[in-house]
């Protein structure tokens, strides 16, 4: 029998996962090469959601580009808006009113919270944790209600404007926000009770999809996925933009760089976003929410690159102006695209079951990948 076993040969097979698959979190296709259940090769096949946003921007005024940014990471529209309008303002040398800066921070951190809630809920659901799906989505609904109250939309918000924001917050906004922040710790405690300490969840995630700090840096990984590898790097602290230097908050880190830590780090970051929002509410000044800018902007000739700390990592905009009213060139550096590039590295050698965990833990949005 032993001799016969030694002569057994296995044959590798190729398996298409996606582009329509509940665990790919969008129209993403992975071509897996399998030896039994072991993953020996992963090929990322993207482009199914490519809409040509960068090219479309060349035929739109600077203000008309704003709605397109909502459709990058459509789970964090406020952050996309912020990164783009600050890029334009940087080239213009435009100063934004104080109240608008505080409102931008509040909306950006709410957007970060909403994105992290989708990640932790979806990852739990991918591992059949149906009950754990509900608490994050329950609280996320309240964030979307706040967005709708302010700008009339829930996902594609188009709230930021070059020089400020589209409108001031309505009278009931701050009480509703205060109520949400008071209830947020309960949701985090629920997730810790249902998932973080769950032995089955730990068995499925700890040590799975592990990436060390050196490799993460080599791939250009940023954001929560990098901080899960132990590096406390966050643009809000390292190179503060807007008014983030006025707030007191920590940068949570974990050290294992595996799927479990990538899940937990987002729960920890939710607490810090809530801290920032509370401070912004306390310091919120009166005043205008929009600087005086022409209806049709013409930027000076030049180029600029600006980065912000997005929900999934560093989000960057490279803008070239020829002196006209439309961008000559706009390039978007999207963290989901970078994070997806590391997926084969963390998946080869694991099992096909682990691949589902890895996709969920790196937290990609295909609108941002394909652009």
Curated annotation (Swiss-Prot):
Organism: Moorella thermoacetica (strain ATCC 39073 / JCM 9320)
Top-rank EC class of the record's enzyme: translocase
Subcellular locations according to the entry: Cell membrane
Reaction catalyzed: a quinone + NADH + 5 H(+)(in) = a quinol + NAD(+) + 4 H(+)(out)
EC number from the UniProt entry: 7.1.1.-
Alphabetical UniProt keywords: Cell membrane, Membrane, NAD, Quinone, Translocase, Transport
Family, per entry: Belongs to the complex I 49 kDa subunit family.
The keyword Cell membrane is annotated on this UniProt entry: yes
Name of the protein in question: NADH-quinone oxidoreductase subunit D
Complex and partners: NDH-1 is composed of 14 different subunits. Subunits NuoB, C, D, E, F, and G constitute the peripheral sector of the complex.
Keyword Transmembrane: no
An MF annotation (GO) of this entry: quinone binding
Membrane topology, as annotated: Peripheral membrane protein
Gene Ontology cellular component terms for the protein in this record: plasma membrane
InterPro entries reported in the protein's UniProt record: NADH_Q_OxRdtase_suD (IPR001135), NADH_UbQ_OxRdtase_49kDa_CS (IPR014029), NDH1_su_D/H (IPR022885), NiFe-Hase_large (IPR029014)
